[in-house]
């Protein structure tokens, strides 16, 4: 079933500009309180100018362009500007440090980068020390360094015409994005997302929350995440609604922003709910127009009830991952909600619980959550240049192995039990244990290392490191945490350290993690 009618992203934006014209499409609020507004017509023109900018810099269909940006209008301009000329966006998590960012640049084959002055020194170092295909950098800031191969994004964009100059043939099967996501291995994998994937995500997510063109969808989720892109932005734009993108989440500012922009839909993770709940109660707690809060794992029933009661909202549970593009299991408007169920399979999807031999399990039995979709349409196409990893999770008939465990009841409601092996969920970020262990293992005093996730009242899970030192060595907490802060993104730095004489292992030499909780 083709629900997008062969419409790629270039056609989508041209049609939206024609249909909605001067209606507000995008509002961006910076952390400093600066607000930028764009109508559908204006936003399409900015997207066209950005597409022309990339064309003048030599970007053509199939080329990869990396974005290392916080939430800002330029992210939206670049995302769809690249799509209009058939180029491919590679968003980089704005929290990543040099080594991780360099690895994504190398493995995505990105030839151009758009970033800000905040991150530019890191990329100067990358260009000097790492082998990449990067040949040019555009900075979104006004002031520019006097370096070769660096241009002002804004100046170049403003010199471009508002009509598209380069329009190669496009197909909905063309790749629009490669989004690198943490996996159970030490390195992230590039999830290949097509024009069809993004168009479908817009329609699906708008259906999921019954979004109308007179509504406002506000998000504080980072634009480099699939949640912001496919659950929020694509839903809002596909419905002709207004999309509000806040640069940084602030528990103190959140409800004021919801009220100011008259938001009717938002999305959140447990960390957001918990930090909102510790704010002082206010008479304005219920003074808003939110009718649904899209919610992503994992919260106790007591926390859920307290949040809904205090703020007068409903949580609409949605379960998915980067590979599924959208929340393929979730609550449905007009349907009963059965907390702590994560809901039922959405339209265009099938879901099963399978055992270790890939056989379907009956209701009530715990196994792996598996999802059936259409590759490159309702689920991702493949892992970029990684057929082995693709074959490990995708069957030829479209069944995706999530690696998560759960069960279902007799009425088709699914329940999440545990997340995929060796992953830690921290404040909305997936953190690979193996990745952290490989970094920490480079410390000259450390002989053996394992990291685990432990329950955290605010950020889902905290990270605890268990280390065995080389004989005769001592290691202070200060030295350990300083080493981590210098070698990994802030959200990956462990919160706790325990030094042991030995780590528990089974007969095959694998660490028994459950003994370290």
UniProtKB/Swiss-Prot annotation:
Show the InterPro entries listed in the entry. AMP-bd_C, AMP-bd_C_sf, AMP-binding_CS, AMP-dep_synth/lig_dom, ANL_N_sf, CaiC
- SUPFAM superfamilies the UniProt entry points to: Acetyl-CoA synthetase-like
Name of the encoding gene? caiC
Q: What does this protein do?
A: Catalyzes the transfer of CoA to carnitine, generating the initial carnitinyl-CoA needed for the CaiB reaction cycle. Also has activity toward crotonobetaine and gamma-butyrobetaine.
UniProt keyword annotation of Ligase present: yes
Q: Which domain of life is it from?
A: Bacteria
Q: Which PROSITE patterns match?
A: AMP_BINDING
Extract one GO BP annotation from the record: fatty acid metabolic process
One term of GO molecular function: crotonobetaine-CoA ligase activity
Keywords in alphabetical order = Ligase
Q: In which pathway does it act?
A: Amine and polyamine metabolism; carnitine metabolism
Reply yes or no: does the keyword Ligase apply. Answer: yes
Give the family, as the similarity comment puts it.
Belongs to the ATP-dependent AMP-binding enzyme family.
Catalyses which reaction(s): 4-(trimethylamino)butanoate + ATP + CoA = 4-(trimethylamino)butanoyl-CoA + AMP + diphosphate; crotonobetaine + ATP + CoA = crotonobetainyl-CoA + AMP + diphosphate; (R)-carnitine + ATP + CoA = (R)-carnitinyl-CoA + AMP + diphosphate
Q: Name one Pfam family in it.
A: AMP-binding
Q: What is this protein called?
A: Crotonobetaine/carnitine--CoA ligase
Which Enzyme Commission number(s) are on file for it?
Answer: 6.2.1.48
């Amino acid at each position: 079933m083709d629900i997008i009618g062969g419409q790629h992203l270039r056609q989508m934006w041209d049609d939206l500009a024609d249909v909605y014209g001067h209606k507000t499409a995008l509002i961006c609020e910076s952390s400093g309180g600066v607000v930028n507004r764009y109508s559908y017509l204006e936003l399409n023109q900015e997207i066209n100018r950005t597409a022309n900018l990339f064309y003048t810099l030599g970007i053509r269909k199939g080329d990869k362009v990396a974005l290392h940006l916080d939430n800002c209008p330029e992210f939206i301009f670049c995302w769809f500007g690249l799509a209009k000329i058939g180029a491919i966006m590679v968003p980089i998590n704005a929290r990543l440090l040099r080594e991780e960012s360099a690895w994504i640049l190398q493995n995505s084959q990105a030839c151009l980068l758009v970033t800000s002055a905040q991150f530019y020194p890191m990329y100067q170092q990358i260009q000097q020390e790492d082998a990449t295909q990067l040949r040019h950098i555009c900075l979104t800031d006004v002031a520019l360094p006097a370096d070769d191969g660096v241009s002002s994004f804004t100046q170049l964009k403003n010199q471009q015409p508002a009509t598209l100059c380069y329009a190669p043939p496009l197909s909905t099967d063309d790749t629009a994005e490669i989004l690198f996501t943490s996996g159970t291995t030490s390195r992230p994998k590039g999830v290949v997302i097509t024009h069809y994937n993004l168009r479908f995500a817009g329609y699906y997510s708008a259906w999921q929350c019954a979004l109308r063109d007179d509504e406002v969808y506000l998000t504080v989720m980072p634009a480099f995440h699939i949640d912001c892109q496919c659950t929020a932005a694509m839903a809002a734009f596909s419905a002709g609604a207004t999309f509000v993108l806040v640069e940084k989440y602030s528990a103190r500012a959140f409800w004021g922003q919801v009220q100011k922009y008259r938001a009717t839909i938002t999305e959140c993770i447990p960390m957001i709910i918990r930090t909102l709940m510790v704010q002082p109660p206010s008479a304005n707690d219920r003074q808003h127009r939110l009718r649904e809060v899209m919610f992503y794992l994992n919260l106790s029933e007591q926390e859920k009830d307290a949040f809904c009661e205090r703020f007068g909202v409903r949580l609409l549970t949605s379960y998915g991952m980067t590979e599924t593009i959208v929340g393929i299991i979730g609550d449905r408007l007009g349907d009963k909600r059965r907390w702590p169920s994560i809901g039922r399979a959405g339209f265009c999807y099938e879901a099963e619980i399978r055992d270790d031999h890939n056989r379907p399990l009956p209701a009530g039995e715990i196994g792996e959550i598996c999802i059936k979709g259409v590759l490159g349409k309702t689920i991702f196409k493949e892992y970029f240049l990684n057929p082995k990893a693709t074959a490990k999770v995708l069957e030829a008939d479209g069944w995706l192995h999530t690696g998560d465990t759960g069960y279902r009841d007799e009425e088709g409601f699914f329940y999440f039990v545990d997340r995929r092996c060796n992953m830690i969920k921290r404040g909305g970020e997936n953190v690979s244990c193996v990745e952290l262990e490989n970094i920490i293992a480079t410390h000259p005093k450390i002989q053996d290392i394992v990291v685990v996730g432990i329950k955290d009242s605010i950020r889902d899970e905290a990270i605890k490191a268990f280390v065995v030192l080389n004989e005769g060595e001592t290691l202070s907490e200060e030295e350990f945490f300083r080493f981590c802060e210098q070698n990994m993104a802030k959200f990956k730095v462990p919160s706790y350290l325990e030094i042991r004489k030995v780590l528990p292992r089974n007969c095959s030499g694998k660490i028994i993690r459950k003994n370290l909780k």
